[in-house]
From Swiss-Prot:
Residues 817-819 are annotated as: G5. Its main location: cytoplasm. GO terms for cellular component: cytosol. NCBIfam families: IF-2, small_GTP. It comes from the Bacteria. Residues 727-730 are annotated as: G3. Residues 32-502, 535-567 are annotated as: Disordered. This is Translation initiation factor IF-2. Keywords: Cytoplasm, GTP-binding, Initiation factor, Nucleotide-binding, Protein biosynthesis. It comes from Synechococcus sp. (strain CC9902). InterPro entries: EF-G-like_DII (IPR053905), IF2_II (IPR044145), IF2_N (IPR006847), P-loop_NTPase (IPR027417), Small_GTP-bd (IPR005225), T_Tr_GTP-bd_dom (IPR000795), TF_IF2_bacterial-like (IPR000178), TIF_IF2 (IPR015760). The lineage of its organism: Bacteria, Bacillati, Cyanobacteriota, Cyanophyceae, Synechococcales. PANTHER family: TR-TYPE G DOMAIN-CONTAINING PROTEIN, TRANSLATION INITIATION FACTOR IF-2-RELATED. One of the essential components for the initiation of protein synthesis. Protects formylmethionyl-tRNA from spontaneous hydrolysis and promotes its binding to the 30S ribosomal subunits. Also involved in the hydrolysis of GTP during the formation of the 70S ribosomal complex. Residues 478-492 have a biased composition (Basic and acidic residues). The gene is infB.
Amino acid sequence: MTSSGKVRIYELSKDLGLENKDVLDAAEKLSIAAKSHSSSISDSEAGKIRSLLGKGASPSQPTAPAAKPAPAKPAAGKSILSVKKAPASPGVTAPVAAAKPQAPAQPAASKPLQPSVKAVAPPARPAPAGSTSAGSTPNKPATAPARPTAATTTSTPRPAAAAAPSRPAPSKPQGAPKPQVVGKPSAPELVSKPTPATKPTGAAKPAIVSKPITAAKPAVVAKPAAAKPTIVKPTAPTPRPASSPAAASSAPPPASTPRPAPSRPTPRPAAAPSRPGAPQGQKPQIVSRAGAPPRPGTPPRVGAPTKTGTPARPTPRPELVGKPVPRRTGGVGAPQRPGTGVPQRQGGPARPGAPTRTGKPGAPTRPGGNTLELVGKPIRRDGSSASGRPGAPTRPGAPTRPGMPGGMRKPVAPGELMQLQKPISRPAAPAPRRPDAPNRPTEAAGTATPPVARPTAPSAPRRPGFRPGAPGGQRRPGRPDWDDSAKLEALRSRSPQKQRQKVHIIGENDDALAAQTGGFAGEQQAMVLSASLARPAKPKAQQRTAPKPVAAVRKRRKETARQRQRRRAMELRAAREAKQVRPEMIVVPEDNLTVQELADMLSIESSEIIKSLFFKGVIATVTQTLDMPTIEAVAKEFDVPVLQDDVEEAAKKTVEMIEEADLKHLIRRPPVVTVMGHVDHGKTSLLDAIRQARVAAGEAGGITQHIGAYQVEIQHKDEARKLTFLDTPGHAAFTAMRARGTKVTDVAVLVVAADDGVRPQTLEAISHARAAEVPIVVAINKIDKEGASADRVKQELSEQNLLAEEWGGDVVMVPVSAIKGENIDKLLEMLLLVTEVEDLQANPDRPARGTVIEAHLDKAKGPVATLLIQNGTLKTGDVLAAGPVLGKVRAMVDDNRQRLKEAGPSFAVEALGFSEVPTAGDEFEVYPDEKAARAVVGDRASNARATRLAQQMASRRVSLTAMSGQANEGELKELNLILKADVQGSVEAILGSLEQLPKDEVQVRVLLSAPGEITETDVDLAAASGAVIIGFNTSMASGAKKAADATGVDVRDYDVIYKLLEDIQLAMEGLLEPELIEEALGEAEVRAVFTIGKSAVAGCYVNTGKLHRNCRVRVHRGKQVVYTGDLDSLRRNKDDVKEVATGFECGVGADRFANWEEGDRIEAFKMVTQRRKLTT
């Protein structure tokens, strides 16, 4: 014993008088970790080994005699086993050969002894009565290996057991284990009744039968046949009269001939354990502890022999001590030993097709044979006996299982043994009966259907089907064997035999099968797999359904995360390639696109755009926002034209003002005419001529900067007709205004100056009119000026698909002179003719709907909006909602400043009473009450906030084309502005113009932009942020001027947009650092070199300009510059001078340069600072 209180294996072997390997075998069966004779084990583990080896010795002897009858057969195959232990019991001689296998069986027996410790199914236990009495202890069943058929059944089920026997226990005669049986009083019974030898739990063990192993069934088939021989001896005592006659008749033939296993030969080489006897030891894992309550849902085994001593207590279904294994009934047709009256597990239904053993009175047959659980290794049941009669039991009392050849069995191949180790628990629900299985339990004994021929078991990965047993045998359980709940139950009830479970090698060769057992721990998975592999193939009918789930699992399992990523990448690539078609044109919304959005629009990879920008000197990311020039440059590289969305989208009519309910009340309404064209082409002058007013003369700078709405009444065919004119700005900054004017118009008048022709804003106006789908009437203005050519204008317009009527087109073109009033009447007549064709109608009897043309904040009136009513009638006091702004009309005035009480369709009015300045371009609608209007406004307000936030983010974006090195280094300067204008349209125009200013080194940030006067709050904000306040056509509120003076805030007021933009650009340039530039002074030529001490002086002649002392010089020698630095001394006739002019000679010296040579050219210059300009 070691100092820590542990015992070494070699010390224990000395105490027991055994060899080291015998003790190691016993430790292995008990799942005790012991690698060599010097390994240490605890006292409790040593006690277990002592009890196992001590008890096993005695039983083996009695078992040997029992085995005597069978020795002949087993001896041949099991000669390997040593007969040493067999002699222990008299009469064992003949069985000795068989005993060798039993030696392995003995280990098996030991495992049963440990069932509590290890879930070792008691292999065939020889002890009948004794076992029975001792059956209460699981250990005894372990000894059961000696027992014949019953024992076999028990041992067979344990696949793990089979693995355990990997190393033969020949050194230890089975006699050792058998002694355990002998120890039990039932030992004598064993001879008389080999089957009873199985411990009561052993009876449960028979459930092992479920495992389809032909060889294994007889006696721990997985175990070497040696164990069987032992069983054979008990078989010798034919005393098993209880068995049905059919069983008796069939018994001998099976012993002589292996059961017909259609799919594979009776001995399954794969299933044969490496060591014959050991398998039985492993089987004990399956052994259920005596007295253990049957597992819920498991039907009692039919025909399983029960210990005589335990009849009172229903034999509990063997619990899966180790790996769960389906229990099998005692061998089919194997009669119960006489005298074993232990009833079958109580409550367990008789297994259909399994004959009840005569010896078991009152044992209910198990109706749900399908629900059998694999307690140990499943054993193949063959319906046919040697005699060919299926269901014929082996010799009465023969321990061998029905259908198994008598005598010693050939050891199962290690590979198959591993497979057998997979435990399978079956759900209580009956599985579908196999076609070959008899429907009734009684049929089993009488008429047995011949077993269905099955193909040979496939390779390890394939789940072998179940081989049918004798007619009386259990039917093959179906998929229910793999029920998760049953497995989990088995895991809970099984004894700690985890080390033993490690034996499964299945994982080495079969990954696919390992995948099938998902949801179980590694060891349990391997066990389950091994059990499934041990089964023979199913009949074809069932095979179709069985593989399906496996295939599905495999399919899912095959795809790894990397494979899935590759597949998705390929799908995305294919999708991109499919839509790799370049668009004919892209429309850029609101001059704002990210790299990724542009890539999607161009149907190219974002990396291509990033690469293109990189070669242009711009570092970009996929989320970088691009400005319009950059978008156009990138799109041009890919040959895709770009169109700004606001050019067309803003001009589209999105809301239909006429509803279905208005159709019965429509009347003719006046047309709305929008006057558009390039700046200074005479739009407002033309309107003045039509209105006979002088509006243009009163406009700042002579240009229109907001929309004007006017109504003109003219005579046409002796009838007064009204026309509503909208005058739009022509400056490039007022694109949004022009778009809004076109959106509400019925006819567009395109004004083109005859002396200027088609200009950029002319083209934009054309695109607006086309987007709004309104007819165009061209007014060729200024025909009275010199150099005017109407035909040239028509030619240029024809290039824009506007062909004059006189040239065969459909566009009305009228030459006019706004100053002289020429052809004005003709133009109006053409407008009325065009609008008559349009059939313009509206319903004046409904609440008004229309569009906000312009809006501003008046310091006296508050928010004021110019509304164009497109349908219905607007009255004073109406509650209306204009976008997210709520208003109640307090007053209305027309273009002549006359107050109105109501205004009909196509009328333009200025309305007062809004809660805030509405947004120009929003539609308005009158609601019956304020509550309904507020509900609508609430929803719109939340949307407006989100839109505003997006716009603010967009205004802060950095243009890629404007990004410079200084900006990357954090030296980008910012000019903060606060913008206040008279109307909303002017604010939009100025913001749009500021976006076009170059931002290489100075970024413009608009902190606040709104219509209205400049307030003290604006001044405070400007003072806090260092901003400049820009006012456009607005004034300052009281107190604002004083606050601005006090805080030193710069407030600028403008009335012409040109001047405003010019000053802002100058302010941006003022933030730039001045740059140093060279200013040339003159040149001189070296004609002589004088050495003075260590330095040298050059005698020079000034050719051009002047030389200044301390100026910068470059010395050129040929094509090279040999020196650049300061000119330190300048002398003339030995006098220091400040400068030498052209045509004079002088001496030049530089402290850092003395290598003068004749012919050198001296270039004199100085560095001066210069104000920097913004570069576009």
